């Protein structure tokens, strides 16, 4: 599952807020996010409107902190469990 979330980045003189796609595991725990902030997109006006509606829903959710997310991903990298289960191919 994924949704848009507002993420705060603390700068030296000010904070900035941007929208990111955030991905969750089956328990609702954040397991990943887009590398870059998202912009509204659609291949039609209707799709663009739908994307904007999803983005507006992010404003009703708690703001996430970029430093906290970075710390979480350092301690438990996204997809770590999946990668840990992959064995290298052995040539014969």
Enumerate the predicted regions with their spans.
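Short N-terminal "domain-start" leader segments
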Residues: 1-20, 25-27
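A general marker of short, structured functional hotspots
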Residues: 13-16, 20, 37, 50, ...
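Residues in flexible loops and secondary-structure boundaries
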Residues: 14, 27, 41, 67, ...
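Low-complexity intrinsically disordered segments
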Residues: 45-92
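A short, exposed loop/beta-hairpin motif centered on an aromatic-Gly-Thr core
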Residues: 31-44
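Generic structural signal for short, flexible, solvent-exposed coil/loop and linker residues
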Residues: 8, 12-13, 29, 48, ...
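Short linear sequence elements within intrinsically disordered, low-complexity coil regions
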Residues: 9, 22, 28-29, 46, ...
């Amino acid at each position: 599952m994924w949704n848009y979330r507002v993420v705060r980045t603390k700068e030296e003189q000010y904070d900035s807020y941007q929208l990111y796609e955030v991905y969750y595991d089956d328990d609702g725990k954040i397991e990943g996010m887009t590398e870059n902030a998202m912009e509204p997109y659609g291949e039609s006006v209707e799709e663009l409107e739908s994307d904007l509606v999803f983005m507006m829903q992010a404003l009703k959710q708690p703001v996430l902190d970029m430093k906290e997310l970075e710390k979480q991903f350092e301690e438990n990298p996204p997809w770590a469990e999946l990668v840990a289960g992959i064995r290298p191919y052995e040539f014969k």
